[in-house]
Amino acid sequence: MLSYFKELSLRRPAWLLLATLACTLEVTGLYFQHKLGLIPCVMCIYERVALTGLLIAGLIALIAPNFFLFRWLALVLWGFSAFKGLSLSIKHYDYQANPSPWNQCEFKPQFPQTIPLDEWFPNIFAAGTVNCSEKQWQMLGWGMPEWLIVAFSLFMLFFLIVFMSQFKRAKPQYRSVFR
């Protein structure tokens, strides 16, 4: 099984799938914001940044998945983004499951001064005035944080499988004179 995932990681379609899934979730969030009128909270914006990291990881590996540097850079970014997105989604769920005055998120995203994404791309990364504990949307009884926990858990699971597969040695190519 690991050799199968190693072979997948050496080809572009698998990385295109990662980028497409992340882009689909990103576009879905933007659709909820701009078309359905749901105002994103700060945690939603942070989760959106994690999805952007997954998208960038897929695009980096699309350049040349056979080259060690591109593949490992994409793997590191994939793992970090999936882990960070999962931890942010769990924290966001905690805000909604246990609302209290002392368990709240910030009012404005705290991006580094060198990369103020909320100022550079306000239509994508600017948060509204919504409290993180407010549930604005549900599907099948689950809110946005629960669905993102599922999504980031799957991203993390497949990252771990692909990461472990990188240490699998390739099968030697036996060449026959008569073949």
Curated annotation (Swiss-Prot):
GO terms for biological process: protein folding. It is found in: Cell inner membrane. Residues 1-14, 66-72, 166-179 are cytoplasmic. Pfam families: DsbB. One of its GO terms (cellular component) is plasma membrane. GO terms for molecular function: electron transfer activity; protein-disulfide reductase activity. Disulfide bonds join C41-C44, C105-C132. Residues 32-49, 91-146 are periplasmic. The chain crosses the membrane at residues 15-31, 50-65, 73-90, 147-165. It is a multi-pass membrane protein. Keywords: Cell inner membrane, Cell membrane, Chaperone, Disulfide bond, Electron transport, Membrane, Oxidoreductase, Redox-active center, Transmembrane, Transmembrane helix, Transport. Required for disulfide bond formation in some periplasmic proteins. Acts by oxidizing the DsbA protein. Belongs to the DsbB family. This is Disulfide bond formation protein B. The gene is dsbB.
